[in-house]
Amino acid sequence: MFDPSPARLPVTETPQIVVVGCGAIGLPLATAFAARGCDVLGVDTDPARLAALRAGRVGLIDEGLGDALATAVGAGRLAFTDTIAPADRPRAFILVVPTPVDTDGAPLLGNVEAGADAIVAAARDDDLLLVRATVPVGTTRRLAGIAAKQGRRLHLAACPDRSVAGRCFLEQFSVPHIVGGMNADATHAAVQLLARLGPTVAVSSPEVAEAAKLFANVQRDVTFALANQLALASDELALDFGEIVAAASEGYARFALARPGPVSGPCLTKDGALLAHSLSADRFGLARAARALNESLLDHVAQALARHVSALPRPVIAVLGLAFKGDPPTADRRGSFGVALADRLRADLAHATLRLGEPTSGQAAERDLDRAIAGADVAVIANDHPLIKALDPSWLARSLRGGGLIYDACCALAPVAQALPNAVTLRRIGGHFPAAMASKRAR
């Protein structure tokens, strides 16, 4: 492993930590540093978010974060502002802003560039600028060039966040932080900083750190796509995917598959595009095909639902699960399969009534899963929140209209050994999936 030993120590006193971007990733990170006793300033441009944070209110679902934020704000270790002002003390700036892509998959790096400009304008020489955002390979080095052109000598390093939504705060202390600086001094400064939270892995350059995050997410997208492809093949062959998987894996450790289902959210849906932007277009066919396959599940499910309700004059469809994933719970709906499915059904089935259910919703009506299900013709399981996953298929069947359909898009519900009451059909992509393998879906 790369040795980050510096020629000299660039930080000689405890720096103030300035986290630029206090959303779903930046806020848990800022709070984690404050929980370790650091002096932290969070910067964000959203007035409503700032007002809530100054009052110690989280505004998102993340295990352990609420209490830690209230404690840090109350103790004066964590404050918030909308601007970055110059200071007469060393500071470590951490850039944690969204990096979306456009409809063609091209990265939109305006947030990164604006944040970096604001940091460079306020920083002192030898301050640390740590790029925590997920960016195309080479972005940190480009930002170093921008800082140099403005006459600022900063220590730049990359360390993309790798935590899981819903457990981002806790994973700051457990998931290794992959750190790559522009030189040994920058790497050392970043390692010193992040070692306050948890384990670190020093690498030889920011490009290695940037690529490590993107490679991992592309691997997961491809892994899920393979499971989905084989599950769809099982459907076409009229075979039970779960039975095939159980038989093929019995006493045979060389075979393992993820659980099929939607692959959504703000990361896996676009990180492949960020990596592709760093490469020649003709070198990324497998990952592009995997992303297209995963996105095709929306068509597959929507068409199956349309066929089921085609003869009904006023069908009622309940979509359960609007967050992009359910376990660990999150309220984040960016890139959500459930939201996209609801939008698609509204467009394709104008005569249908949609009911939406989401346990993490701020709206009481959406949290009431019983209300969404009662008397519906179809119930779609669109994420694996524990409260949704715990629904008994037989109870669901009795709650639906006779001849109804339960479409478990996530393969989250318990297996059913016999016919369901009320002439209700339970359908999954590829059939059932062995319960013992369900944990392999976590992301």
Language-model regions, residue ranges each:
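Structural/interface elements that position substrates and couple domains in central-metabolism enzymes
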Residues: 2-443
